[in-house]
């Protein structure tokens, strides 16, 4: 049995930054530290931070007065920011800078009353935060997920239209939606550079390159992780069965029956410790040597807020 390890995999710069913000806040200000929504979508990471004193909530109303709250990497709406300001909560913003870039695009369009189409998954916190940047009553903002949604879309002014996308989508599927938008609305404008984040692109490329060489793909990531789900879906689209897991005990022997090569990758919110635990579980079940593949080098780094840089930990 051969176990091939994708590269790049796991943590991206935005996730690294978000986790560091929570860790530094816990160290410098002491527990409890409140975090609005899971700071990143990984059960392993969230449980570790809970044990250190982080309290995860879904609404600001759950945060007591005079406390610290951290916004998750997925971003929040302007309404949430305004509520925190009105309550004079101390806020540390762990929103990924690449998500903030999309927020700025939407806010800029809103100020000019340009209608905006967001490509994304309904209910995802990043989508909720991005939709919440639009305030113009003269324009409008619309959510689409697939090309068929575009055909049903009714806008006020097709000549004054802009699109943005969630940062963790399938590269191929997003391209299909953009193609349909351009077909239905020939004058639509978009970002100069794709909104899909570099880490999402790189991890999908790594799966694309590896899928034909393996018989089954194990994606390390949580079920609520958008980018991890896209990796599993991409593998299956390419003809290689894929399984998503964030717990070694969930890995089943039946996944590997009749297989000789196993591919392992990890979503952008999955830590390397968890990847190693999953690999150990696979080896305990079926044996096998691990070969780490070469891949695109990532050197992106995002600073934590200045207030959290005062003290090294």
UniProtKB/Swiss-Prot annotation:
GO terms for biological process: dimethylallyl diphosphate biosynthetic process; isopentenyl diphosphate biosynthetic process, methylerythritol 4-phosphate pathway; terpenoid biosynthetic process. Its EC number is 1.17.7.4. Isopentenyl diphosphate binds at residues 41, 74, 124, 225-227, 269. [4Fe-4S] cluster binds at residues 12, 96, 197. Signal peptide: none annotated. Dimethylallyl diphosphate binds at residues 41, 74, 124, 225-227, 269. Belongs to the IspH family. This is 4-hydroxy-3-methylbut-2-enyl diphosphate reductase. The lineage of its organism: Bacteria, Pseudomonadati, Pseudomonadota, Gammaproteobacteria, Vibrionales. The gene is ispH.
């Amino acid at each position: 049995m051969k176990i091939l390890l994708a590269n790049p995999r796991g943590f991206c710069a935005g996730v690294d930054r978000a986790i560091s913000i929570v860790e530094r806040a816990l160290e410098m200000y002491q527990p409890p530290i409140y975090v609005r929504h899971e700071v990143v979508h990984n059960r392993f990471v969230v449980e570790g931070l809970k044990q250190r004193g982080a309290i995860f909530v879904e609404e600001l109303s759950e945060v007591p007065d005079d406390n610290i709250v951290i916004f998750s990497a997925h971003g929040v709406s302007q309404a949430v920011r305004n509520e925190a300001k009105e309550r004079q909560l101390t806020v540390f913003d762990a929103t990924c800078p690449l998500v903030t870039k999309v927020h700025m695009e939407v806010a800029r369009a809103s100020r000019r009353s340009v209608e905006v189409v967001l490509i994304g998954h309904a209910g995802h916190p990043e989508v909720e935060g991005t939709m919440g940047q639009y305030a113009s009553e003269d324009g409008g903002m619309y959510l689409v997920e697939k090309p068929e949604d575009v055909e049903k879309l009714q806008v006020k002014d097709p000549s004054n239209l802009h699109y943005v996308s969630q940062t963790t989508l399938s590269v191929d599927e997003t391209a299909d939606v953009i193609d349909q938008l351009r077909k239905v609305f020939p004058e639509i404008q978009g970002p100069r550079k794709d909104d899909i984040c570099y880490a999402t692109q790189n991890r999908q490329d790594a799966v694309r390159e590896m899928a034909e060489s393996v018989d089954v793909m194990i994606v390390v990531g949580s079920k609520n992780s958008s980018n991890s789900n896209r990796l599993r879906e991409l593998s299956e689209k390419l003809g290689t069965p894929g399984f998503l897991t964030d717990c070694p005990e969930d890995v089943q022997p039946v996944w590997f029956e009749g297989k000789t090569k196993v591919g392992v990758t990890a979503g952008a919110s999955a830590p390397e410790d968890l990847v190693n635990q999953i690999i150990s579980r696979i080896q305990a079940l079926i044996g096998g040597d691990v070969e780490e593949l070469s891949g695109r080098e990532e050197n992106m780094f995002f600073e934590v807020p200045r207030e959290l840089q005062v003290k090294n930990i």
